[in-house]
Amino acid sequence: MARLVFRKNGKVIENPEEIKSFLSQYGVVYDVWGVDRLPEDVRKNYDIDEENSKAIIQAYEKELKELKEKMGYITEDIVVLSEKTPNLDGLMAKFKREHHHIDDEVRFVVDGSGIFPVKIEDDIVDIHVEAGELIVVPAGARHWFELDENRKIKCIRVFKTPAGWEAIYNENETATMRD
């Protein structure tokens, strides 16, 4: 399950309700949708194709519809990062640069896991997410993304506009990232 790790003092929060409560103070949405409804072969398949994508999106149709209506999102797709991803290290180098978006960054983790370090006040909070969990990093929040030791993640991404997801880097700001 999710875990928050505060870099300044090493504090860890693992209780889902405490995570949800803390993050909501800063506009970050955290929720658990679970993965029980997905057949394991669909969930674990990292060779994504149209049939696999449709099966995943259909399995979460109700939650996606509610999220879209509540937050104004219009479309979704599936993203996969794994050892099979061409130029994975090059992609990860881009994702590990501190940035923000003009739109929310919405990810529902279908399989795998990852870390969203987010600047919160004068600290950096590592938000560890796993299969079955939803995270919404609000527009304008300074953050980046890292794969964890498993080096794979499969997510539903949700957008208001495709252009809104483009990263905006500020070369004058630096973040403390793990190498």
Curated annotation (Swiss-Prot):
One of its GO terms (biological process) is L-methionine salvage from methylthioadenosine. Transmembrane segments: none annotated. The record marks 104 as: May play a role in transmitting local conformational changes. Ni(2+) binds at residues 99, 101, 105, 143. It comes from the Bacteria. CDD domains: cupin_ARD. Belongs to the acireductone dioxygenase (ARD) family. Fe(2+) binds at residues 99, 101, 105, 143. One of its GO terms (molecular function) is iron ion binding. Catalyzes 2 different reactions between oxygen and the acireductone 1,2-dihydroxy-3-keto-5-methylthiopentene (DHK-MTPene) depending upon the metal bound in the active site. Fe-containing acireductone dioxygenase (Fe-ARD) produces formate and 2-keto-4-methylthiobutyrate (KMTB), the alpha-ketoacid precursor of methionine in the methionine recycle pathway. Ni-containing acireductone dioxygenase (Ni-ARD) produces methylthiopropionate, carbon monoxide and formate, and does not lie on the methionine recycle pathway. It comes from Sulfurihydrogenibium sp. (strain YO3AOP1). Keywords: Amino-acid biosynthesis, Dioxygenase, Iron, Metal-binding, Methionine biosynthesis, Nickel, Oxidoreductase. The lineage of its organism: Bacteria, Pseudomonadati, Aquificota, Aquificia, Aquificales. This is Acireductone dioxygenase. The record marks 98 as: May play a role in metal incorporation in vivo. The gene is mtnD. Monomer. SUPFAM superfamilies: RmlC-like cupins. The record marks 107 as: Important to generate the dianion.
